Amino acid sequence: ARARRHGLTTGEGATAEGTAAEGAVPAAFRPMLAALTERANDASTAVVDMDPKGDGTTVSMTLTWAELNQQVNAAATRLHALGVRPGDRVNLMVPPGARLTTLIYACMKLGAVIVVADTGLGIPGLTRALKGANPSFLVGIPAALSAARTLLWPGVRISVEPLGSVQEKLLGVAGSVFTAPAADGTPGAPVPTPTVVEFPSPVPDADAAVLYTSGSTGPAKGVVYTQRQLAGMRDAIANTYGFAPGSGLVAGFAPFALLGPALGATSVTPTMDVTRPKTLTASALASAAAAIDASVVFASPAALVNVVATADELNAEQRAALAKVQTVLSAGAPIPVPLLEALSALVPNASLHTPYGMTEGLPVTDVSFEMIRQAIAEGTPNAAGEVLDPFARDGVCVGFAVYGAAVAIAPLLQDGSVADELTHEPGVTGEILVSAPHVKDRYDTLWVTEEQSISTPGWHHTGDVGHLDASGRLWVEGRLAHVLLTSQGVLTPVAAEQSAESLPEVRRAALVAVGPAGTAAPVLVIEASANTAALEARQSASGLKRALLDRVPGARRFPIAEGVAPFELSQLVRQKVAEDTGVELAAVLVVHEHPTDIRHNSKIDRPALGEWASKVLAGA
């Protein structure tokens, strides 16, 4: 069910229990706090904050490992004095940085359960999430405390820093964790507490965190992790990417910064609006890298797009800092090869990786840019017209399962449902199932969703669709919810989208269905980036000039109206998609910008586009 007509098979594979066991890596439980405890007397840098009010080029706060350990213990003692006990849920509404890192590890020290529902969910989504999680405490900045009072968010309210007595009374605040900043702006320390607290030993299978999905495929879901599963995530990342004490991590995706202390890595979050990843600039990223002599960078695809777009602002020192980076990780949405190529020029000595995973388990697979190139070459006819691997195509290559993980396919059936049995047969499209020590414990208070996700014992149903190639690499073809049941058969969206995106006139594309399931028409909605004069340039050119324009992704562009695409553009896209995938498009529509999720700014809201496309084609 790649994005062309498919002969679908159910396939025969190993049993769920047998295959899941293959990926498991038994290991002794190492608590998330282990590295912090071991480095309690280490005077080297643990956490760095960049100035959030400036241009992202200056450091505002630095904590050594010894200082971080002291602050975590002091903050845990203060939270205990304010009533936090083992098992209590604590909602942390604090911007990424040293403060949030300290609070997270303080909660772990107490055996409390952190609730992380980011503001990227929007106010309605955030309210729904928090009322579902029902935390006992809410630790936040004034804006969060004010929202909590107005929107009746649950939990005893605790301020990060002291508020005036009037404001404390107005917001119903029980106290603060940290003292006020000093006159010179130096951040305050945890409020001194005379009580001596005996911290509990970590319980491996006790709840540790409730994290929330992005809400890009429906209401955000709370995902519960135990101490053991968080440690498994840390171990998967450490073993896959070679993290070691002394590694420097620039986290353009905030959750990864929080893993820094557990990995034994020095971490920094670059200056950016965390709810809008595409606000990350090359200068801010490079300055953050320079601040910790970074070896690893993690950023979302949308963030990297803007980093590449603003690269001309870099000075020699910033370019030198990026040249020291050894690994770049990016996940959350497919990353086009041209973006990876442009990024390579900024980090010339780095290996680029695009891991696949989800809130329920990250990472699941990993692939390097070199492996992507190799896979594409194997799926492309050579000079003799031979194809080494006919299944190395029609999707996004995300590589092989990471340390401790296993992947299998539940074949897609003609009605869009999936088969019960699993397979590893190359070329069979179906739902992607994963098994790993770091996959979630359960969905929070979503019992039906949880039962569906674990309906195959030992496996998590991801809701993504894809296939394996002859080498065992995984190729993602889209979301199960976005599979199209058309008159041409069952189609998955990614291959047709990739085909259209290979044209210089198309920045981004989304395949949607218009009409009843089973007889729906495939419609491609393209984003005409700074929209497409490349087409008009091609029409007016000839010979060598026309051939050159065909090769230039940035050929002159200017806006065109949203709605049905101009005839010439439509024909160009239809022909390309038909040649590459066999899919006959019913229509090509144009939008200035696709609707995307807030967290990554990358995941396209295809249901919304489908509704819009139906109205446009109906003349509404």
Tell me the role of every PLM-derived stretch.
Residues 112-113, 231-248, 254-296, 310:
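Conserved AMP-binding/adenylation subdomain of ANL enzymes
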Residues 62-66, 200-202, 208-235, 266:
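Conserved AMP-binding A3 loop
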Residues 138, 297, 436, 441-442, ...:
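AMP-binding/adenylate-forming catalytic core of the ANL superfamily
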Residues 1-4, 8, 82, 110-181, ...:
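Structural core segment of the AMP-binding/adenylate-forming
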Residues 326, 341-355, 359-466, 470-471, ...:
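Conserved AMP-binding/adenylate-forming
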Residues 484, 510-512, 562-563, 570-620:
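Conserved C-terminal "lid"/linker of ANL adenylate-forming enzymes
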Residues 46-83, 88, 94-97, 101, ...:
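Conserved AMP-binding/adenylate-forming core of the ANL superfamily
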Residues 43-45, 180-212, 219, 243-247:
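Conserved pre-ATP/AMP-binding loop-to-beta segment of ANL
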